[in-house]
Amino acid sequence: MARAALVIRQEGPSQPDVIELLRHGEAFSARLYPPESNHHLPLDALRRPEVRFLVARDAEGKALATGAVVLHGGWAEIKRMWVEEATRGRGIARQILNALMAEAGGAGVEMLRLETGVANHGALALYEKTGFKRREPFADYRPDPLSVFMERPLQRRPSLERGRRLCQ
C-alpha cells in the first residue's frame, strides 16, 4: 500500500470541493443507515470555535479527506471523518486520523471518542488498529444497534495553528 503524499491542514468547511466531499460522506452513510442512525455534524457546526476541521489534499490541491475534532474540555469527539472512496487503500485515513489525534492532544484532550456505524468495516478496523476500544454510548447518544461507540486515551501534544500543515 503506497502512502499518499498529502498536506493536511485546518480549513474552513465552505470551499465547494470540501462541501462536495462532505456530501459524498453523507450519501455513503445514507445508503447504509436510516436517518435516525446518521449523526453527521451539520456544516454550520463545523465552523464553531470548539471544532477543529481538517482537510487532506493531494499534491495538486485536490481535497481527498476530511475529519473534525469537537473539543469538550478533557475529551473530544471525532466527527466527519471521510476519505473519498476512489482514493482509499493509500493510507489517507490513517494520516488524517493521526492528524486529528495530534490536534486533540495539542488542545489538552486526554480522551478521544467517536461513533461510527456497524457496517463501516474499514473504519472499525482502522479505529481498532489505532487503539480505540468499544464503549457504551456517550454524551447525547442513545443505544443504537447500528452504532458503535469507541474511545482511546491521548497524550497531550503541541497544537498547531489554523492553516498550518499538520502532515506532509
Feature names for model-found ranges:
Residues P13, R113-T116, L124, E128, ...:
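Conserved catalytic-core motifs of GNAT/GCN5-like acyltransferases
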Residues G73-W75, M111, S147:
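A generic structural signal for beta-strand entry/edge sites
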